[in-house]
Swiss-Prot record:
Keyword Oxidoreductase assigned: no
Gene: glyA
Quaternary state and interactors: Homodimer.
Database matches in InterPro entries: PyrdxlP-dep_Trfase, PyrdxlP-dep_Trfase_major, PyrdxlP-dep_Trfase_small, Ser_HO-MeTrfase, Ser_HO-MeTrfase-like, Ser_HO-MeTrfase_PLP_BS, SHMT-like_dom
Source superkingdom: Bacteria
UniProt function note: Catalyzes the reversible interconversion of serine and glycine with tetrahydrofolate (THF) serving as the one-carbon carrier. This reaction serves as the major source of one-carbon groups required for the biosynthesis of purines, thymidylate, methionine, and other important biomolecules. Also exhibits THF-independent aldolase activity toward beta-hydroxyamino acids, producing glycine and aldehydes, via a retro-aldol mechanism.
Pathway the protein contributes to: One-carbon metabolism; tetrahydrofolate interconversion; Amino-acid biosynthesis; glycine biosynthesis; glycine from L-serine: step 1/1
Family (UniProt): Belongs to the SHMT family.
Keyword match Transmembrane helix: no
Primary localization class, coarse: cytoplasm
Species for this entry: Acaryochloris marina (strain MBIC 11017)
Protein name as catalogued: Serine hydroxymethyltransferase
SUPFAM superfamilies per the UniProt record, alphabetical: PLP-dependent transferases
Length: 426
């Protein structure tokens, strides 16, 4: 039976070659970017399906186009599975991305010029939580909070003081580079004091929430957004969830027709597949290993003398503060790339460097845990990272680390069903 790559090789060898080379890169590299993961073959199959052919503006049972009976069935399945997975009363599975989901929520709950609170990007927040370069920072008055300078963790008393002073209409919690448990109940208490909405963006930790390895925000938050990839291990896309049915209807309108047109039903079907996978017992086991592996990586790097932001991690990611070894995040990112490790430079709290340089390296465990690696392999990964960063100019160390990476990758194959040879690029 022909794979999608086989078909592409026959019809468009140029793009087939690019795809095959990217597949080989993913196979040959240690993927440690915290926001990346490897979907199952089933998710890939659903996303590359005939559902891409169908326009389906509206919601299941309320479409503006005919011929949507099977589209409705797929989307409703995604909705029902997401409700079961997170314990939500209302779910919209149509946002094309987490950023789209967040913008739809802002459009629903805020008016231009309203004040909201979100975490500073340099402390672990996200662009869509009020960065001045994002629409969230252009349309609204943003009060940013950060972490405590000593613990490098959230200080809820300080956040409360800011909230009482500025009285925002909404508080956003949930982050892109925060390695610790978030206390949603404390955020709820703060929001209630000022009669504010509470929004949680769990894009990074959604899989951990679904599996019980991180507290669920839904009992405490008015609305929860997430992406469907990262720790949830689905296709790239967004999700909006709430326990409030009336608010849910408003979010639906802000997605369509407010910010989007036709939904990507092939992606929604792939979301349904991923949610179904996440409802199975082995997904809980997987997420447990994700946390164990991240903690192992942090501990082993600490033993090699590296400073870890907040002194560890409770979730899937960790931040390495490189100032102690006189290296920038940009330099470290480039250095680990030389030995076929993919990571990303990242600001650390109170970072003196620009976002284009940074003082930190963000590392995550989800992707390589998906490939089957455990604490023994993550111990070796930590030592490879330490060896190559501590001796950045040593060619022998570079070659040794590259070979150790190759050995690890060969033991844990990726997508073995995709076996097409690499076609020549033209």
């Amino acid at each position: 039976m022909q794979t999608s790559l086989d078909i592409l090789t026959e019809t468009d060898p140029a793009i087939a070659g690019i795809l095959q080379q990217e597949l080989q890169r993913q196979r040959d590299h240690l993927e440690l970017i915290a926001s990346e993961n490897f979907t199952s073959a089933a998710v890939l199959a659903a996303q590359g399906s005939v559902l891409t052919n169908k326009y389906a503006e509206g919601l299941p049972g309320k479409r503006y186009y005919g011929g949507c009976e099977y589209i409705d069935a797929a989307e409703q399945l995604a909705i029902d599975r997401a409700k079961e997975l997170f314990g939500a009363a209302h779910v919209n599975v149509q946002p094309h991305s987490g950023a789209q989901a967040n913008f739809a929520v802002f459009l629903t709950l805020l008016q231009p010029g309203d004040t909201f609170m979100g975490m500073d990007l340099s402390h672990g927040g996200h662009l869509t939580h009020g960065s001045p370069v994002n629409v969230s920072g252009k349309w609204f008055n943003v009060v940013q909070y950060g972490v405590d300078p000593n613990s490098e963790q959230l200080n809820y008393d300080t956040i409360r003081e800011l909230a009482l002073k500025h009285r925002p209409k909404m508080i956003v919690c949930g982050y892109s580079a925060y390695p610790r448990i978030i206390d949603f109940e404390k955020f709820r208490a703060i929001a209630d004091e000022i009669d504010a909405y509470l929004m949680a963006d769990i894009a990074h930790i959604a899989g951990l929430v679904a599996s019980g390895h991180h507290p669920n925000p839904l009992p405490f938050c008015d609305v929860v957004t997430t992406t469907t990839h990262k720790t949830l291990r689905g296709p790239r896309g967004g999700l909006i969830m709430t326990k409030d049915l009336e608010l849910g209807k408003k979010f639906d309108k802000s997605v369509f027709p407010g910010t989007q047109g036709g939904p990507l039903e092939h992606v929604i079907a792939a979301k349904a597949v991923a949610f179904g996978e996440a409802l199975k017992p082995d997904f809980r086991d997987y997420c447990g290993h994700v946390v164990e592996n991240a903690q192992t990586l942090a501990q082993q790097l600490q033993e090699r003398g590296f400073k870890i932001v907040s002194n560890g991690t409770d979730n899937h990611l960790l931040l390495v503060d490189l100032r102690s070894i006189g290296m920038t995040g940009k330099q470290a990112d480039q250095r680990v790339s030389q030995v076929n490790i993919t990571a990303n430079k990242n600001t650390v709290p109170f970072d003196p460097e620009s976002p284009f340089v940074t003082s930190g390296l963000r590392l995550g465990s989800p992707a390589m845990t998906t490939r089957g690696m455990g604490t023994a392999e993550f111990t070796e990964i930590a030592n490879i990272i330490a060896d190559c960063l501590l001796k950045p100019e040593d060619a022998a160390v570079t070659e040794d680390c590259r070979q150790r990476v190759a050995n690890l990758c060969s033991r844990f194959p990726l997508y073995p069903h995709l076996t097409s040879p690499v076609p020549a690029l033209t």
